Amino acid sequence: ATVTESDIHCIRAKGKLSNLREKLAGGENLAQVGIGHTRWATHGKPEEYNAHPHMDMAMRVAVVQNGIVENYRELREELKVRGHEFRSDTDTEVIPHLIAEFLALPSSSSPLSPSPFLE
């Protein structure tokens, strides 16, 4: 995922970095900042839709991580109740959705306010 002034542009590929390199070949990218990650599949099939980075629904938050979200099933269900839609089967995808929830809080809300997501 790369970042320009107003957008996050995300290109993912299944498998080796050479697969991603082929997808990027010949394209123009003016971004000066980006993130990427290769990871062994721990949740979900090793398919492109499960590849990192993962984004929120508005495509404003991109996340890569190399860990396991132990309570991702519970968080995913809570987020679905709140209207979130998921594009992957991975545990990581809950993270950008949680960040989006936090960013949507009114500015007067305290980050320490009780939240069903603080577990």
Please describe what each predicted stretch is.
Residues 1-119:
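Conserved short alpha-helical segments that host acidic/polar catalytic motifs at enzyme active sites
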